[in-house]
Amino acid sequence: MTKRLPAVKTQKGWSPLLKRFTVRNYKNFKNEICLDFSDVAGYQFNLDCIHNGLISKMIIYGRNATGKTNLASAILDISFTLTGEPGLFRGKEIMLNADSAEKTALFRYEFSFGGTEIVYEYAKESRAEIKWEKLSVDGAVIFECDFTCDTYDFSNLEKIGAGTVNTEIYRRSIVPRCDVTRVGEVTVIPFLRWLFSNAVFAQDSAVTALFSYVVNMDIVKTQTAGGSTSQYDRFFKTLENSNNLHELEEFFNAMGIACRLDLKKLPDGQYELYFAHDRKVPFFSTASSGTLALLELYRRIIYSNSSPSLLYMDEFDAFYHYEMSENLVRFLKKRYPKCQIILTTHNTNLMSNRIMRPDCLFILSRCGTLTALCRATERELREGHNLEKMYKAGEFDRYE
């Protein structure tokens, strides 16, 4: 697993944020789809959904099979591109749109780093085969590589402090397609990945900021903790500390699960978590699907004390009661004020100005468009509007 990098800050104290993401010809997204974090309306409520002028908390709705999960893998593609870690990308995968004649999928990431704008874009034929890539900083092209035409422009590397890097070493490392015999072998290492591994950058440089953000991106797919405790032994060992066990107990209670917990080490060295009653009740064999899903979320994200830059939680509340869903949204907003969190759900109870706002609630349509509620109606949406009622009444139907 790729080691997380510490969050990078400018002298103004700003950490890098994703400003805009665009992808085309990827899976069901034949046409260009854009996720614009900078499209902030002027609402003066629930300001904790905004950070440094960009959307930091959003919820995406959409009918089944509109591509909410595909959007997650598209956004996280940069993580594999720049680190080589497979993450959620395992096995042979169909990447290109089945109805398009285009031979590559196009990705574009625009980052805001204090007063600096960083744009990284590339084209891929498959998950591992990159055909073209370009990096720009504040409108100036730093480098551009066309691997199909074998043309390279490294003329502005000095602008990011990499002017002394020997790019000929990189060019000689590129494996010709005819030399590749194993299916799925990477033919070209993206230049930006190679550059970060072979050059030394200042802690506050644009490249360090970009990698810090990418390495700390994460995705959580809906799943329960499963029936076996073996994969949890390391986590359970930390719960031998009574303070850590109490924090987990407090988390469950804050989510609406009234319980007390106990942990025992078994004779075989493994650990067993229990609900503490007059008689101890084994946790894994009796906990509900929602409770197991909460434990998995706690173990993976919350307890690790990681500071994710972007967290995509797909169908995050599939096992939760609507009140627990709302509790978790409030918890995430408070726990991760600077993290850009994207939640997908079918739970319209969260389509509310109590905890969100119209510019942070999106509809992913069957034709591959992503529209904020405030852009999906001619009506001026205000804090007092019942967004869920309007949604069910068909106010936003033409954007579904």
Predicted regions and their residues:
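Short alpha-helix of the ABC ATPase nucleotide-binding domain corresponding to the H-loop/switch region
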Residues: H321-E326
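Conserved P-loop NTP-binding catalytic core
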Residues: G53-I59, A72-S126
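Conserved Walker B
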Residues: Y26, E315-F319, T348
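Extended helical coiled-coil dimerization/tether regions that scaffold
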Residues: V8, G13, R24, K221-T286
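Pre-Walker A-like glycine/lysine-rich segment at the N-terminus of P-loop NTPase domains
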Residues: T2-D77
